[in-house]
Regions:
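Conserved RNase H-like, two-metal-ion catalytic cores of nucleic-acid enzymes
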Residues: 1-111, 115
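Mixed-charge, glycine-rich, non-catalytic linkers/tails in nucleic-acid processing enzymes
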Residues: 75, 84, 94, 107-110, ...
Length: 195
């Protein structure tokens, strides 16, 4: 049984079917991860190309992929895989809040009512930019103040299979929060169909 068959079997056991939402993260040379309402999994790269596995899942299930940005779709297209439908977290952020700033840290901050000006900056550590010794999980995706950690938002999510799995779970969480926000837009009832 190939890797794609094993993942497909897991999706069937989870009840994922045609058109169901499924968060997807692809990290070349690391693997891929999926998340859904009641679970997640990470598929490390061995000999299998993550795009190949996604292509087989697309053909068998045709889910609506939840992706952080269109970079995921671009990676798949470059590998010869075309997906039919996506929930692009960055694009939905633009529908909800306007503007063009839709990087993961900004999306997360807006959905969690955190000030954009307090988004942590990335870059090398210096006198005024040191790790917080009070952080509950110094390797986790979230800081104690609720913001995404700068290293994660800047690509550190792709460091290993465990991190890509967590990044997929966060994409699912953002999608769920965006769905709630869209439902609150009574004055624009058609916006949810655009998302």
């Amino acid at each position: 049984m190939g890797r794609a068959d094993a993942v497909l079997g897991e999706m069937h056991r989870a009840g994922i079917g045609r058109g169901d939402l499924l968060a997807l993260v692809v990290a070349p040379r690391v693997g891929m991860a999926l998340a859904w309402a009641h679970g997640s999994l990470s598929v490390p790269v061995a000999d299998d190309d993550p795009a190949q596995v996604v292509g087989q899942l697309e053909n068998a299930l045709r889910p609506r992929w939840v992706v952080w940005t269109n970079d995921t779709a671009t990676t798949l297209v470059d590998a010869g895989v075309r997906v039919a439908t996506c929930w692009d977290v960055a694009a939905v952020n633009r529908l909800l809040f306007g503007g063009w700033r839709s990087d993961p840290a900004s999306v997360w901050a807006r959905l969690h009512d955190l000030p954009l000006e307090t988004i942590p900056a990335s870059g090398p550590l210096h006198l005024f930019n040191q790790p917080d010794p009070e952080e509950p999980d110094p390797d986790g995706a979230l800081r104690a103040d609720g913001h995404l950690r700068a290293d994660w938002a800047d690509g550190g999510w792709a460091a290993n299979p465990g991190r890509i799995r967590r990044w997929a779970e966060l994409a699912w969480s953002v999608h769920a929060d965006q769905t709630l926000r869209l439902a609150e837009l009574a004055e624009r009832p058609r916006v949810a169909t655009t998302a």
